[in-house]
């Protein structure tokens, strides 16, 4: 099992020290969330809570994920970084490819691109991007960005984007792509790529998604070998819980270790101490 420390809702100044600690303590990676802005009033309900309200308070930090990854890549040696999740369709494909590719180059093979199609229509509008057909645009953007990340000249013609013969440097190492979401559409998109990222979910519900992904991969003649299943679990607290998850095919856990010990108001020192305790309590070294 690989453990990723989530940086969601952290103060930006804490992330560097959390990353250094995670690197030293043997965590596999860090999860880096993405929001450009936080609007005071929304008509669009948040899809992952029963009441449609956002999980975060106003004035929560949302640092740019690629600037953040570039910074922490330079102060760590083995830690991986995954976006949880980035919304390509809210940007233009060339700026997105440049930012992602540069961060991947600096991370030297330690970047994992987690993507979603988004839920907040108002944020798309503010960014000058259409909300409708964002799923199809996301698929095409991924194809275009993969072409831009290859060495040499490339050109592209699609339904939404076209590119004359061009090149983009620096050329990054291979970037695995994981897709977030709980719907069948999101799972199918994940099955076509390199992995799936879940939301806050029980182990039983996560296992249902794993079984569905296995079916979808089999339909395409693909195995689950080297396919990443990465999710937070709301009811996993012990080594036995994580062993059950791993036996089902879940191979990555997103967690905030300090939440098990000192809670959401933890100081930076308490967060790092919680990471040490969690490492010991779940037998991170096996």
Where do the protein language model's features map onto the residues?
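Active-site-adjacent structural elements that line small-molecule/cofactor binding pockets in enzymes
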Residues: 1-286
């Amino acid at each position: 099992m690989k453990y990723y420390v989530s940086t969601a809702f952290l103060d930006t100044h804490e992330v560097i020290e959390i990353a250094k600690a995670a690197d030293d303590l043997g965590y596999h990676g860090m999860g880096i969330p993405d929001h450009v802005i936080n609007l005071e009033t929304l008509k669009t309900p948040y899809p992952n809570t029963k009441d449609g309200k956002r999980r975060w308070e106003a004035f929560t930090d949302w640092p740019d994920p690629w600037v953040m990854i570039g910074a922490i890549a330079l102060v760590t040696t083995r830690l991986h970084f995954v976006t949880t999740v980035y919304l390509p369709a809210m940007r233009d494909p060339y700026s997105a490819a440049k930012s992602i590719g540069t961060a991947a180059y600096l991370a030297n093979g330690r970047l994992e691109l987690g993507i979603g199609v988004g839920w907040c229509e108002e944020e798309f509008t503010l960014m000058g991007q259409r909300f409708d057909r964002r799923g199809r645009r996301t698929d095409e953007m991924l194809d275009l960005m993969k072409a831009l990340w290859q060495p040499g000249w490339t050109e592209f013609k699609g339904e939404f984007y076209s590119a004359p013969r061009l090149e983009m440097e620096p050329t990054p190492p291979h970037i695995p792509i994981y897709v977030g979401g709980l719907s069948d559409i999101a799972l199918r998109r994940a099955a076509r790529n390199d992995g799936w990222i879940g939301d806050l979910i029980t182990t039983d519900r996560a296992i249902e998604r794993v079984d569905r992904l296995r079916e979808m991969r089999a339909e395409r003649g693909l195995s689950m070998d080297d396919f990443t299943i990465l999710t937070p679990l709301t009811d996993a607290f012990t080594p036995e819980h994580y062993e059950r998850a791993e036996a089902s095919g879940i191979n990555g856990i997103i967690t905030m270790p300090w939440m098990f010990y000192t809670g959401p108001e933890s100081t930076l020192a308490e967060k790092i101490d919680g990471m040490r305790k969690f490492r010991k309590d779940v037998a991170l070294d096996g």
